[in-house]
Amino acid sequence: MSLTVGVVGGCGHVGLPLAIALAAHHEVRIVDIDLDAVARVRRGEMPFRDAGADEALGEALRRGMVVSDNPEVLRECNVVIVIIGTPVDEHLNPSFTVFDRLLNQLHEVLRAGQTLVLRSTVYPGTSERVQNDLRRRGLQVEVAFCPERVAEGVALEEIRRLPQIVSGFTPAGVAAARALFAPLGVELLELRPLEAELTKLFTNVYRYINFAVANQFYMLAAEWNIDFHRILHAMKHEYPRAAQMPAPGFAAGPCLLKDTMQMSAFNNNQFFLGHSAMLVNEGLPQFVVNRMLRRWPDLMTKRVGILGMAFKAESDDTRESLSYKLKKILSLVSGEVLTTDPYVSDPNLVEESRVVELADLFVIGAPHRRYRELDLKGKPVVDVWNHRGAGSVI
């Protein structure tokens, strides 16, 4: 069954790949307040990197996908998908301000019989909170929570391949969620809304904790001047029970830390494992700088180049990137910090060739593929990731 589907926040890293995927099966209307992104998407330009999305965007537009900054286009939609999560505030507690503001805007265009699908990660109980809010406003709108579980950069590919979790408070809400995703041809997993909310949070927190384990092991080994990557290889080689151990590196981005803190808040801040993971992962940049100061006591006389400012490899997304935290710390203890990234738009970045020429030493901030073979003129490289294969001891 073909639906008319609205995607609020549809020009972002989560919303646009979803809109493109759904446009092959439904009539899709994107709404976004980012006027620059709206203009670019209308022209058929992806505002960010995502594998296979450039051509697919063109196909979606040719199918009639609407891209607008006007919520009025949502009035005739059967399903309205919201790509807005619950952020954390300055105290690392969940903030509902964005959601409340959105509902104040949407209630003017929502109508009885529609289904509102929450797609982004939310604090547990948010779906029910939204449903109750709509009921208080007299809107008989179904609410479903169907979390995204994609990795940035390959979102479109994963939407077409991964099982979709669907949940709702009524049979009608669940049926609408199923009708939305069934044409993708993937498996549908039905849960209750709170179960679905926790599934997404547990998944992200599990990953964050795993990264913390690897980073803690790396720091322990480094204190004894041992290359943890040699140990990691021995742990994982032909040994299935350690196969899932990640490599060390900056665990960052818009989700993992935020969701770990939301999980803690949900459990009355009794989440010591999550707090420990936060201390390890957020402390890695300071650990790296401390090791650099031991190796180069004259660091204040040196110019340091950071290669890669995105929060992960092959990405242009700098949200919560620990490379920027590293830059701030290094700026206090080194002569100068130069930063570069081939994918990131930032007026403070320096051309890669200039950084290679001017820097006395380098730190791999994001392990973009190009840095593996980049000629760094024999200068020292701090490489927690062991991206260049020369070891990670600082």
Language-model features: locations:
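Structural/interface elements that position substrates and couple domains in central-metabolism enzymes
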Residues: M1-I394
